[in-house]
Amino acid sequence: MFYLMPLGHVDFLHSGTLWLGLFYVLFPLGFLLYGVNDIVDAEADRLNPRKGTFLFGSLGATEQLAALRWKIAAVQIPFLIVFFVLIGPRILAWFVVLLLAVALYNAPRFGWKSHPPFDVLIQASYLLVFVLSSWLNGAAQLPWQAFVFGAMFAMHSHIFGEVMDIEPDRLSGRRTTATLIGAVRSKLLIAGFLCVETAVVYIFFRGLVITGFLGFGAFWFVLDAALIWKNRPYSPAVMRLFMWGWNAASIVGMFWNWSTGSLTHARHVAGL
C-alpha cells in the first residue's frame, strides 16, 4: 500500500519501472526486513503459536536461518545496481538509511525492538517506501501530512502485532510496548493513533471513505479493550480472521488510492 500511495491514477499497464519497484518492495525488501527479524527472533518465535503458518510467517530451522543472511544480501545487490542506474547516487543514501533502521531495530542487546517506545517509533522508517516510489516513478513526494499519516499507520499496525504476541514475548523475556503497558492500554493507544489519523485524513485530504474506515477502527479497538477481549489473548482463529481482514482492507485501500489519488494532494488549512 505504501509503494502505491504516491502514484494515484498512474498507468499500471505500461510502466515497467513501477512493476520493478513494486516487486522489490513486496519481495526483496520484505525478505530483508522480515528475514533479519526471523534470524534475531529465532528463539522467541519457537514459543509463538502464530509462527510457522502461511499468514503469520515461517519458522525456519537453525540451518536455514544460518544461510539466510547471505541470501538476503545477494537478493539486494541486483536491485541496488538497477536502482543506481535509474535513480542515481541518491539511492545509496536510501539504502544506508534502510540498513541503519534495520540495524537499530534488530541489534542484539541494544536493538530498539526490545526498548519501548523506540520499538514503535522506528516503524516510521517504512516511510522510506514513499521516497523510493516517488524517485522511481518520477512522482512528486507526498505532502508532509501524508508522511504523518503513514508513520502513524505503521506504528499502530506494529502495536497491534505486539498485542497478538504479548504471551510469547513475555515467555521469551522480550520487552515491547504491549508487554510493558498491557493489552487494554495498547488497544486504547491504537485507538488514539487511529483517531489522529482520522483527523489528519479528514482535515487535510477530505478522504471520507478512508476517514470512515479509520474511525470505525478506532471505535472497534475501544470496544475490544472495554468489552470484548479486554486483556485476554486472541484465539488463533480470531488472529487469522484479523489477518485476512487486514489483507482484504489493504487490497481495497490500494485500489481506492489508485482510483482517487486522495492522499497525494493536501488541502491548505489556515494556521497549519
Question: Over which residues does each language-model region extend?
Answer:
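Multi-pass alpha-helical membrane architecture of UbiA-family
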Residues: 1-272
